[in-house]
Amino acid sequence: MTHSAWHDEIKQVLPKDYYRRINRFLDEVYATGVVYPPRDNVFKALQVTPLEETRVLILGQDPYHGPLQAQGLSFSVPDSIPAPPSLQNILEELAADIGVRNHHDLSSWAEQGVLLLNACLTVPEGRANGHAGLIWEPFTDAVIKVLNAKDRPVVFILWGAYARRKKALITNPIHHVIESPHPSPLSAYRGFFGSKPFSRANAILEKEGLGQIDWLK
């Protein structure tokens, strides 16, 4: 389901039967409709980025709801798929901040310790936020709480009002928060563009002795 260290720590935060409730939810929704991402990618963020290697969290809201887009990592799509508008703007800001990245698949970020987590881990086809408020938020809040309890600094990148509300869960003063409006076309020009989240995250990581992320990889 998830990387074992994540599983053990999250289990301490959630009610005892919560994993069972999640599995029942997944059985039901995947049996009765088209749901993204593919079921074996639902927990991909926690499988690719182990707890002990997490240096940065980029929090999304829910997966892309179109065919072949969602792959279990927030904002990421396969390289064969055109970049959705929010990802286009992320890559545009990255180009202005650090340099040009030609890949839409953000897996290499995840492999370097960037946890690409959505607050909701599933979505019904064609219905953005269609699974909001049903099962996922306590689980993904638990992920943030587990990171908050770490004794090694984490950089939390929070884009948009929804993600920024999660700042209330980040109470440990050793951590760092970078926040701005969302990269969506509706809000990117209100302060996402020019916010330089990638170079700012690297400056923090370097200062903390944790090594920089190669955002262009």
Swiss-Prot record:
Catalytic residue list: D62 (proton acceptor)
Protein origin, superkingdom: Bacteria
Catalytic activity entry: Hydrolyzes single-stranded DNA or mismatched double-stranded DNA and polynucleotides, releasing free uracil
Gene3D superfamilies: Uracil-DNA glycosylase-like domain (3.40.470.10)
Class of this enzyme: hydrolase
One Gene Ontology cellular component annotation held by this UniProt entry: cytoplasm
CDD domains listed in its UniProt record: UDG-F1-like
Family: Belongs to the uracil-DNA glycosylase (UDG) superfamily. UNG family.
PANTHER family, per database record: URACIL-DNA GLYCOSYLASE
Name of the protein: Uracil-DNA glycosylase
Organism in which the protein naturally occurs: Streptococcus equi subsp. zooepidemicus (strain MGCS10565)
